[in-house]
Amino acid sequence: MTEEQRQQIHAWWQVFQHGGELTEIRIVGKYTDSGYYKDINNLIRDVEANEHKGAVYFTINPPKEACYGRKQQEQMPTGGGKMATTQDADVASRRFVLLDLDCVTGVSDVNSTDEEKTYALAKCRDIFRYLRKEGFNDGIVNDSANGYHIFLPCELENTEENTKLVKRFISAIAMQFSDEHVKVDTSVFNASRIAKLPGTFSAKGSVESEDRPRRMCKILSVPVAVVATPRQYFERIANLYPEEERPSAYNNYSTQRFDLDDFITRHGIQVTKKIAVADGTRYILDHCLFN
């Protein structure tokens, strides 16, 4: 492990574990190795000894204190035996909402090119500016090795209602910002979500690839003060995401789904591009229908 790696892990510890909270480190490869830590020295020791096995992750939200009683307390047992890891019900509370910006590479299990990452960085900046304009407190931005992570500080109880809120919030961001180059991952809404540990490398692809290299995950920017954004700001963005229409007097209690493709064809609307986003499709029209 290099000095730069150690510095990145120490920086992550200061930012994410400043209250001395419990964290789980998980290494996902042929097997899944796991450890629960309150001591950064033990954590670095085990990451250094095991990082060659796969990608290294941390829980973005603190596990309940009881998880510290598991057999992985301050250690990472080896041998590939099955062990308990942090599940949604094991999370004490939500401290961060993750926006995960993935480069669209066209094929699976490869690292991104420099050009693909350039698109992702521009998108990351667009989202960051948008959220700041909407009143959000600044988040922490990480280079995830193959894309970018924005960690938005929050203070949310770990409830089903808040899980639905976070899911709709992320989907609303994806609806607005995902395109053919960059995808905002809508699957990262769960409370026990893990993210790439700064100071560790991507485990994807070939180590010999020059145009798709294995890169280190790094912290890029941290606000002067990490301050939680109030719940109502997340709600306001989440409410932009459309809900599926239910049968009502307004639609004659119809149970049929509106066929947008058929509507476009019947009315001769010119579509220049269709882009898959979140749970739907974005249509880029040749011209505004109201001009």
Task: Tell me what each language-model feature is.
Residues M175-K183:
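Histidine/cysteine- and/or acidic
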Residues I140-N146, V182-F189:
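Short, glycine/acidic-rich hinge or "gate" loops at secondary-structure transitions
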Residues D88, G139, T186, A276-V277:
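Residues embedded in well-ordered secondary-structure elements
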Residues M1-N146, P153-A172, L260, I269:
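Signature for HUH/AEP ssDNA processing cores
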Residues R95-E134, A145-Q176, R193-S209, R215, ...:
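Modules that initiate DNA replication and primer synthesis
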Residues I27, R215-M216:
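Positively charged, low-complexity intrinsically disordered regions
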